[in-house]
Amino acid sequence: MKKTQDGYVWRKGTGVRKGNLHCGGVVDPPERQTAPVDYIYDAVVIGAGYSGLMAARDMTDCGLSVLMLEARDRVGGRTYTVESDGFLYEMGGTWVTHHMAYLFQEMTRYKLDRDLILTHDRQYANDYYTINVPGATPRKLSHEEAGEITARAWNIFVNVDGQNCRAICPLPHAQLDNILVDRLEVERYDKISCRDRFEEIKHLLTPEEAGILTALLLHISGGSMENSSLWDMVRSHALMSYSPDNFGPIWTTFKLRQGQSALARAMFEEAVDNGLQYAFQTPIKSVIDETNVVKVTTTGGKQYRARRVVSTIPLNVLHTISFTPPLSPTRQQAIAIGHVNHMTKIHADVKGSDLTSWNGMRYPNLLMFGYGDGVTPSGNAHIVGFGKDERDVFVPERDPEKAIDAFQKLHPMEVEKMVFHNWNTDPWSQGGPAWWRPEFMSKYQDELQSRHGQVFFASADWAHGWRASIDGALEQGSQAALQIIRELKSACNKPVKARM
């Protein structure tokens, strides 16, 4: 298995080291270009995350000539798997579910829908939950009781319409302009922050409920209570079939046994079999749309031409790319604002297996939640810790001792190793998956989803339904590919797969 330049590992004896982690998503050699230098592709896809993979696979499958350009050395974008000491660590997106239609379709296509493993194993010694929040005595409790506390607080928080969100968000894949709810009514709720809503209902909550709810909202958004949109929580509730009982089954239970990079690699290899050309470790700096052809220039000075371009560049990175003609003022404003998710995710190998069955939370803390997630080949518990935006005081690769302290504040433990990716200091992400500010959806979603001449924008960061998730990335890549296929096949009558 090849090694990626991404990610960090901390060990007691060596400290923090960057990269050099085995990853099945690494593409080596990094280039395959057999087309002539002056070739005009049907499409250039910028980015090899799930949006880009979906678009490239679908377009090559329908006979279009496609070039993929990717800044990283691997497929997967903000979702990838590394192997260290015989154990798989999910560095970005992790959990899968049959509830996500686009994702389930891909899992089925590559026969991964039943090749799953479970995150939580209840057979180990510390089979309990710990809670530590202001105004309440820290304590141990059962996982079931912790779930009940969380569910009650969440239900009070999201029930903004008195009908468990079913009135205001009946069609979560069509939140704006659906046939049941007036857009102006949705926009009214979209103006509300999580802080605003929390202040409305906090008198109904116990200290434990208030603390765990606050931490959960920040865990989800990766931002602050003030800059996190209430609507994003309403949307999430609707997507979970209007029940917090589905938090676990949908968001934190099932993983691909072979890892996310196995799925990403399968999509990539099928596209390659269909004739996909590609260049990895190839950042771009500009996109020039000349109507009949679009020119994409790399930071290394190479230029590629295509009839269409699919940009899957994350929202928080788009400001680094020059577009000609300029993007609309509305899109430029959205890009300047960006999204709020600057979360932290750190894997820890903890001495002994006892904490494998433990989950817990502490707020405030640099890592608010910890989840037991399997046993390493050496017999240690694998714990995953999550925190909100702490960029001003915490940079994990610079402050590993703060990370260890945060784990130990969640529960006494001896951390022997940490594995992580800092998406906030990563130039190709500049944050995690997109969670939005109040009013951002109302003002900018339509524009972010729209095309700009012959340039299509496809990213989970502005998906219709599962925004910020793998499913949303696949949705956006699929929709961009479908439109380009229709346009180009109509113009050129290409019925078969292309081979260079």
Residue ranges and their predicted role:
Residues 60-84:
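Glycine-rich FAD pyrophosphate-binding loop
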Residues 173-283, 312, 322:
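Active-site/ligand-binding neighborhood in enzyme catalytic cores
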Residues 280-295:
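A conserved short coil-to-beta-strand element within the FAD-binding core of flavoproteins
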Residues 2-11, 15, 118-228:
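Mobile amphipathic helical/loop "lid" adjacent to a hydrophobic cofactor/ligand pocket
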Residues 39-41, 299-308:
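Core beta-strand elements of the Rossmann-like FAD/NAD(P) dinucleotide-binding domain
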Residues 309-330:
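Flavin (primarily FAD) binding-site architecture
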Residues 2-30, 293, 358-500:
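Conserved flavin/dinucleotide-binding core of flavoenzymes
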Residues 38-68:
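N-terminal Rossmann-like FAD-binding beta1-loop-alpha1 element of flavoenzymes
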